[in-house]
Amino acid sequence: MLCPEKLTTYCFKSGQVNELTARLIGMAFTSANIFDTDLPQPLTLNPWQLTPMLDFPLKNKQGGVIENNGVFALLHQEHPDWPLILQSGNDFNEVYVQLIQRLEARGMRYVYLGDLDSAGIQMADQFARLLKQTQAEEVAALQQPTDVRLWLADLGKIDARRTKQRKVVSPVYQAEMTTIALFWKFIEQEQLMGVYEVRITEWLEATEV
C-alpha cells in the first residue's frame, strides 16, 4: 500500500467528468487500475514518484492506452474497474516513457485508441515505437486499417488540415495514414465510444492473464 501523503491522486466525482489539465498531463503518468494500490483511481504520478513505481506490484497486466483525457475520464466513469492509461500529451514525457517501457518489460500488454486524424495516427505510431517486445499490429488491434476505412466512410468529417499526410514508420499506421489522407476525413474518439466499450471488453477478456 502506498502512503496517500506521498502519492498524488486525481479523482472524479460521481456523475461528473473532470479532465486533467494539459500542464499536468505533460509532466505526469495517469492510469487507472494498473498498480495494486487501494488509493482512489485514477492515479497520477509525478516525476519524483517514478523510481518506486518502476517495480511496484501490478493489479493488471493489460492496459488500454487512451489518447484524449475526456474519453479516458468517460471510460473510467462508466467502467471503473478497467485498466486504462492516459496518453501523456504530444511530448511523451520522460516519466511516461520510462513507465510504459518498464511495464512492458514486466509483461504489460497494450492496446492504443486515439483520434483517427493525421496527428492521432502519428501519435499512435510513436507510442508503438516505444515498445521493445510488442508489435505495432498488436497495439492497433482495436483500430485496424479495415476498421478505419469503414468508420471514415460512415462517420468521417472532412477537414484538409487534420488529414494531411504525416510521416509514420509502422506499416499498420502507414496504411491508416494513407486512408485518412485519401478520404480527407477524420474521426474523433468521442464518436467511437460505443465501439470502444464493446471492443475493450472483448480485448480484456481475451488477453486476461
Regions found by a protein language model. Give the residues of each.
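Nucleic-acid enzyme cleavage-core boundary/entry regions
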Residues: M1-S88, F92-E104, A119, D125-Q126, ...
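Acidic beta-strand-to-loop metal/phosphate-binding motif
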Residues: M108-D117
